[in-house]
């Protein structure tokens, strides 16, 4: 069925992540260090910490999207390139996360108030549904990262219409293992390792970057498939 035509892309993205794990470490370690630094200062300077983490994830998302989608392989041992593409991709990734997550949280909070059930029990299934139905929003940062040439035309509306829920299901399948890992991280004991950082916060950073790699890899493959369909 065409609804499930992109369900193999998350698995292919996982295989690429496993095969290119040394490249993942090379592309992500500086970005993860920046995110950890942002987390450490966020208690005192919340905006500085949030912006640092946002831009760091944008830098890595561009690198991984272009590695999977275009075959680009930066050769440096440490990678951190911040330019127009990375800023737009970071903003697009944040917008996609808000577009997908915020409605699920609002509905879960409303249901928790109305029914008396715990918010945590309600939000997980709603987040799963939201990723499946609205996950095509991640085509926004994908296009920002994969644009080629100065005359590249804006194809996002066309790609969202063609991808639809099929692209959202790919996002859901890529999001699911990361979410399960983050739930495990939440169960870690609260131990202060550094000033402003607990064990759980430090463990969550590499898990989130794995999640970015899985989602970005799946969406790069979906974008290439949609581009091939359009030609």
Question: Model-predicted segments: where are they?
Answer:
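Hydrophobic alpha-helical membrane segments
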Residues: 1-231
């Amino acid at each position: 069925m065409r609804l499930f035509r992109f369900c193999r892309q998350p698995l292919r993205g996982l295989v690429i992540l496993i095969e290119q794990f040394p490249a993942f470490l090379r592309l992500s370690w500086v970005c993860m260090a920046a995110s950890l630094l942002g987390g450490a200062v966020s208690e005192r300077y919340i905006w500085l910490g949030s912006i640092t983490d946002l831009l760091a994830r944008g830098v890595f998302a561009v690198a991984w999207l272009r590695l999977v989608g275009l075959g680009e392989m930066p050769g440096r041992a440490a990678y951190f390139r911040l330019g127009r593409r990375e800023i737009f991709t970071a903003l697009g990734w944040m917008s996609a996360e808000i577009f997908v997550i915020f409605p699920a949280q609002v509905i879960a909070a409303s249901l928790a108030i109305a029914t008396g059930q715990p918010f945590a029990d309600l939000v997980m299934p709603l987040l799963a549904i939201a990723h499946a139905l609205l996950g095509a929003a991640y085509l926004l940062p994908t296009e920002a990262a994969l644009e080629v040439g100065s005359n590249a035309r804006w194809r996002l509306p066309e790609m969202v219409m063609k991808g639809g829920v099929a692209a959202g299901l790919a996002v859901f399948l890529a999001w699911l293992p990361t979410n399960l890992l983050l739930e495990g991280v939440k169960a870690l004991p609260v131990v202060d390792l550094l000033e402003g950082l607990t064990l759980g916060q430090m463990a969550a950073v590499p898990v989130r970057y794995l999640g970015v790699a899985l989602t970005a890899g799946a969406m790069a493959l979906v974008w290439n498939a949609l581009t091939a369909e359009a030609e």
